[in-house]
């Protein structure tokens, strides 16, 4: 009988220690602590994304309706946030625009915007004042297949609403942070539907898994196959017209664009290839980018995460999210995470997870906002001097205006004028006939 009692005692002790060890492991894993800065207190009234979703971020993609419900929930609980629907996709999904700043700034947000825009109007002679906030724009999910960007908007909004302490108070007092979630709702919904259809609670990181065998080009675009990251100039789609209208209303100092790239890469953010910069982009822009991303570099270094600059991506095409701001008095910063494609994926560089990409995009979002605040005066002065210089060069240029017409094609003329007006380019109807290059442009028709 004694051996039986000893064995029973050992089994009991083993069960106890196993239970204790399991309990310790469960207590040690806190998804919120893993995702968010641990040296910050948070407003307990505001639910974390994990609490709201009922699962850790990255365990499954966030559906569009979940994002909308969460952002509206958090906005209703925080006096730091305001949210509005700025448009709808072709499939009738709303595009949300969040303004995050201090309660004091929220109370005078229209005045802040008006004063900021005045920096881009040389005739108004607006100077940079000591209390003028820097404007940071964060956009997520323009390529729907690159889904971690959209999911990163949830912890970003949570942090801006719930984080407490002097550091975040200073950030919100000195900044207006504009979050557009999500740029491409229909493309993202397409991608999420595939992941939910072929994914499983038992994660399979094999690249040959059906979950990852997806043609990303389908969800990269919007409902009608338009690449919305080539729409910053042409603005023919309802999604791009919605967020570009807001961009022009604010003319941000810093615009950050979040993407995913090939799974065998690490993590990229600007500045890009130095020899591939459009000649219209001021040299000072590249130095400002390097200064603003310094906190993002510090975060990546602090966690021992790999990243790179100056390769693969350039600053040449001006019709995308990281290019257009560079010729409009601000800076554009591209971020690219190596895609997990599903929840997890085996690569030659190790296991890539969806959650890891969400974390990196979220933490660099906050870091970029902090970098913008650190460079507030330089960014605002650069914006003012950019438009002052452009106005001076235009005044000294031999060409004062361009004349155009589209005889017999009123629709073509209408859409061209609409495009110019959308980008705040002044257009006037000819008051008298003008002959140029052997062509006569009739008054009222050109």
How should these model regions be labeled?
Residues 1-5:
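Positively charged n-region of N-terminal signal peptides that target proteins for export
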Residues 142, 183, 260:
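Active-site metal-binding loops of divalent metal-dependent hydrolases
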Residues 8-19:
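Bacterial N-terminal signal peptides
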Residues 191-205:
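Aromatic- and acidic-residue-enriched segments that line the glycan-binding/catalytic groove
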Residues 25-147, 151-176, 224, 230, ...:
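Intrinsic-disorder/low-complexity accessory segments
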Residues 206-226:
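Aromatic- and acidic-residue-enriched carbohydrate-binding clefts of CAZyme catalytic domains
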Residues 172-191:
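Short, conserved secondary-structure transition motifs
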């Amino acid at each position: 009988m004694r051996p039986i009692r000893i064995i029973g005692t050992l089994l009991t002790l083993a069960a106890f220690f196993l239970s204790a060890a399991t309990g310790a492991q469960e207590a040690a894993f806190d998804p919120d602590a893993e995702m968010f800065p641990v040296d910050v207190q948070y407003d307990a009234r505001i639910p974390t994304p994990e609490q709201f979703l009922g699962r850790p971020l990255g365990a499954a993609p966030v559906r569009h309706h979940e994002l909308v419900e969460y952002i509206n929930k958090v906005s209703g609980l925080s006096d730091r946030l305001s949210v509005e629907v700025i448009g709808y996709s072709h499939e009738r999904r709303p595009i949300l625009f969040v303004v995050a700043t201090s309660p004091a700034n929220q109370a005078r947000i229209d005045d802040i915007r008006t004063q900021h825009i005045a920096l881009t109007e040389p005739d108004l002679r607006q100077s940079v004042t000591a209390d003028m906030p820097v404007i940071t724009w964060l956009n997520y999910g323009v390529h729907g297949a690159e889904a971690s960007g959209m999911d990163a908007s949830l912890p970003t909004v949570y942090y801006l609403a719930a984080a407490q302490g002097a550091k975040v108070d200073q950030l919100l007092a000195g900044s207006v942070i504009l979050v557009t979630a999500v740029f491409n709702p229909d493309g993202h919904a397409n991608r999420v539907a595939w992941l939910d259809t072929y994914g499983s609670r038992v994660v399979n990181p094999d690249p040959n898994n059906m979950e990852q065998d997806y043609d990303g080009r389908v969800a990269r675009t919007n409902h009608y196959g338009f690449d919305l990251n080539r729409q910053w100039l042409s603005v023919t789609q309802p999604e791009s017209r919605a967020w570009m209208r807001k961009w022009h209303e604010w003319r941000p100092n810093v615009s950050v664009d979040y993407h995913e790239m090939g799974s065998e890469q690490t993590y990229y953010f600007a500045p890009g290839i130095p020899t591939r910069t459009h000649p219209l982009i001021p040299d000072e822009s590249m130095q400002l980018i390097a200064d603003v991303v310094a906190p993002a570099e510090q975060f990546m270094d602090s966690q021992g995460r790999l990243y790179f600059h100056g390769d693969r991506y350039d600053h040449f095409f001006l019709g995308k999210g990281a290019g257009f701001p560079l010729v409009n008095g601000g800076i554009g910063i591209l971020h690219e995470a190596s895609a997990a494609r599903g929840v997890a994926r085996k690569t030659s560089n190790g296991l890539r997870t969806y959650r890891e990409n969400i974390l990196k995009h979220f933490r660099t979002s906050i870091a970029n906002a902090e970098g913008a605040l650190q460079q507030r005066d330089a960014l605002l002065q650069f914006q003012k001097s950019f438009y002052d210089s452009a106005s001076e060069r235009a005044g000294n240029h031999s060409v004062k205006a361009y004349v155009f017409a589209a005889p017999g094609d009123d629709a073509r003329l209408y859409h061209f004028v609409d495009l110019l007006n959308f980008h705040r380019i002044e257009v006037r109807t000819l008051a008298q006939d003008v002959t140029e290059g052997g062509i006569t442009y009739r008054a009222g028709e050109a």
